[in-house]
């Protein structure tokens, strides 16, 4: 994503979180607060809770499996940050000049997204044929630390600082 940087004066920066199964919501909130960046959690109505924290901004969408993805895709602008584990959504957003990162702190990039999509496709084919494929490993402390560090790096880059 080198070569383009958008001034904060142009628009309010937003972090969108594909929130239904996101394990790093607290880390997103804390890091965003450090940089004074707006966070929008997008989740299905099936995950609605009345007891959300006041500082959290939640948007609820239909329970359709792609509804949160479509909401995010339709509301992001160049320079925004999206946190998702959905490789298909990441692929769509990269063309919109959006920073897309996984919950483990890995940045999706245009030069490697095709390989990630291919791996996902192969795993789906194996599952459909009855073969077992391992799911993701449990998120550990090091994953959370990597996530925070990478999010800080992205937000610093957007603001024109080095971290």
Swiss-Prot record:
It comes from the Bacteria. Signal peptide: none annotated. PANTHER family: UPF0178 PROTEIN YAII (PTHR35146:SF1). Belongs to the UPF0178 family. This is UPF0178 protein BLi02714/BL03680.
